[in-house]
Amino acid sequence: SPISRAGGFIFDKDIYDKIGADKTPYEYVRDNEWTLDTLARTAKLGYKDLNGNAQIDKEDQFGIGSSWKEIYARYINGSGISLISQDENGYPVFDLPDNQTAIDKMLRIFDLFNDKEIYNNPSKSDAEVLANGEIAKHNVLYVLGHPNGMGTKYRQLDNVNVGFVPCPKYD
């Protein structure tokens, strides 16, 4: 159902408490400040060189660890980007090439994926991130998920102090 598959971010509260953010994710949501930039800023604070080799690698702690295609689709939807509209006869029209606002938003989202302190995920899917136990090992601050999976599908979360927030809006 749409409610059971509502997407958002599972976050490790213990990591979050250590990053020095101004507010909790819940406070950002409550204050209508849970935006893509807020997520990126707090995710960047979540990066930590765990193995001390001064290189960004898979042994480090990252801000966001999820499938880029799954997370990108949620960012696009949450940003109000429309790729298709209707013409005067009601037929679908691909109108992205003429929508500079949508292009600018998509480029901003792409920029987030290029900052390896914010996002660096060697896994191919959210299921892999969870199956590999990255959040259970406290190696990632945020991972995509949905509420119904927190009590059933993501069993490794049983011993992790996690929270859940919706996907952020664009601005």
Regions found by a protein language model. Give the residues of each.
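Periplasmic solute-binding protein
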Residues: 1-27, 66-90
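Second-shell loop/turn segments in exported
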Residues: 25-30, 93-97
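Glycine-centered hinge/linker elements that transmit conformational signals in sensory
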Residues: 36, 40-45, 73-126
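Short helices/loops that flank or line small-molecule/ion binding pockets
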Residues: 38-45, 128-143
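Beta->alpha turn/N-cap motifs
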Residues: 68, 145-150
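Extracytoplasmic/periplasmic substrate-recognition and gating elements
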Residues: 154-171
